[in-house]
């Protein structure tokens, strides 16, 4: 049973496809030419119609053209939107993902406004009325001392409720 005693039964296939480049996919009978093109396109073997570079904005379906003034206005609007978003991002105005129950301190935002409102009120009112309003705004020292111990007298349930309400905000 040596290999030289037996005759060869099969033939070898060529290692590469035809020199013309046709493969079995291109010779497949799929019916109409449209179906064949679709099949070849889906298999990645078909050529696309537009092989050249397509220039953006240079298309036959573009029926209207912008005037120079409209183009400048559009560019100015886009630049304005970009500056607004950049300022917002850098200032941290839209802070999200800061954590559960996080809220920015209101005092920081209100303190400049309060100072401005006090100065505007003082310029409008006579000096006699300013001193009276300042006296009314300043509570006596004994009142502040009485208010401080009050939070310690709350029960544990009240503390739990206020703690829970700090995390739950109505929208």
UniProtKB/Swiss-Prot annotation:
The modification Phosphoserine is found at residue 16. Keywords: Phosphoprotein. It comes from the Eukaryota. It holds the Pfam family SMAP. The modification Phosphothreonine is found at residues 20, 23. Residues 1-171 are annotated as: Disordered. Residues 19-29 have a biased composition (Polar residues). InterPro entries: SMAP, SMAP_dom. Residues 46-80, 133-160 have a biased composition (Basic and acidic residues). Signal peptide: none annotated. Residues 117-128 have a biased composition (Low complexity). Belongs to the SMAP family. This is Small acidic protein. The lineage of its organism: Eukaryota, Metazoa, Chordata, Craniata, Vertebrata.
